[in-house]
Regions:
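Rossmann-like NAD(P)-binding element
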Residues: 46-107
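Conserved S-adenosyl-L-methionine
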Residues: 17-23, 127-130
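Glycine-rich Rossmann-fold phosphate-binding loop(s) that bind the pyrophosphate
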Residues: 4-5
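Conserved N-terminal Rossmann-fold NAD(P) cofactor-binding segment
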Residues: 23, 27-65, 79, 298-306
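N-terminal Rossmann-fold NAD(P) dinucleotide-binding loop
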Residues: 8-9
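C-terminal substrate-binding/catalytic lobe of Rossmann-fold NAD(P)-dependent dehydrogenases
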Residues: 126-132, 142-306
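Rossmann-like NAD(P)(H) cofactor-binding subdomain of soluble oxidoreductases
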Residues: 80-146
Length: 306
């Protein structure tokens, strides 16, 4: 774990409980911070599975299965994720070459924001194959959507199948047209549960999901538990070679006329990272919004010097 702030530390805590790893190394510019977090989290090991958790350095990256990068400036109240571009690209310019020097051959998972931009930056700076560099993308946004829909319909959110695609940020797109609850189209399920204002309800839910991070940051200055669980889930899929479908951020080539940009689309994820895209059905309006989201990210990438 590179970066031991709120997100990095919460993610290590979640991973400690998962039983996925026998060794977790924490790396941070502030070595004392990394050591303190490692000590604190290690004291929970007797309640989990045997493993080693310790503060290390970039030499520990060489034989790692997964490197998670959460290092970066955090989002402050009033800031968008894209406001963090210049600060965090500069941080990545110092981190990624250090990883590349160690001939790292595992999976790189980018969590820092803006995650779509930084995933593409990591691909360019690392020289790793595109399929081995993944961003956490809209895995958390999609979980928030499923949670909200489960709450709205009074059903288990695990039975809700719905994705948010595009940017992890303000231009994200809810793929309503492919959303369902255990195979029942969402609009039908809403009526079955006594909700008939489908258009108004979906608009309210989409807005609530998009603004949830801003709301949490305004109330407690950071979000970390939800993303920690997202990191744990992505790591599970990779380590167990589950070939699960997750809306992670990755390089897109030729899906919905989008090419050469990293954003979130459902993909089959396993031990080798991205196996293939799953081009889910989108309405004409959703596809147009997705293209706009991609174009906005592309314009930002064009301004970055690497």
């Amino acid at each position: 774990m590179i970066g031991c702030g709120f997100v990095g530390s919460a993610s290590v805590f979640a991973l400690m409980q998962s039983g996925l790893f026998t060794e977790i190394v924490l790396i941070d510019a502030d070595k004392n911070k990394a050591e303190g977090e490692a000590m604190d989290i290690s004291h929970g090991i007797p309640f989990a599975s045997p493993m080693k958790i310790y503060a290390g350095d970039y030499d520990d990256v060489a034989d790692a299965a997964i490197v998670v990068i959460s290092a970066g400036a955090g989002q402050k109240p009033g800031e968008t994720r894209l406001d963090l571009v210049n600060k965090n690209v500069a941080i990545f310019k110092s981190i990624i070459p250090e990883i590349a020097k160690r001939n790292f051959a595992g999976i790189m998972l980018v969590v820092a924001n803006p995650v779509d931009i930084l995933t593409q930056v990591a691909i360019k700076l690392s020289g790793l194959p595109e399929n081995r560099v993944i961003g956490s993308g809209t895995v958390l946004d999609s979980a928030r959507l499923r949670y909200k829909l489960g709450e709205h319909l009074s059903v288990d959110s695990r039975s809700v199948h719905a994705f948010i695609v595009g940017e992890h940020g303000d231009s994200e797109v809810v793929a309503w047209s492919s959303s369902n609850v255990s195979g029942v189209p969402l609009s039908e399920m809403c009526e079955m549960r006594g909700h008939y204002k489908h258009k108004e309800n979906t608009a309210e839910i989409a807005t609530a999901v998009k603004n949830s991070a801003y709301e949490i940051i305004n109330k407690k200055h950071a979000t970390y538990y939800g993303i920690a669980m997202s990191v744990k889930r992505i790591c599970e899929v990779i380590m167990r070679d589950e070939k699960s479908i997750l809306p992670v951020s990755h390089m897109i080539h030729g899906v919905y006329d989008i090419d050469g940009v990293s954003l979130s689309m459902p993909a089959i994820v396993g031990a080798d990272g991205i196996e293939s895209d799953i081009p889910i059905n989108l309405s004409g309006e959703e596809a147009l919004k997705l293209k706009e989201s991609a174009d906005s990210l592309k314009k930002i990438m064009e301004t970055i010097e690497l």
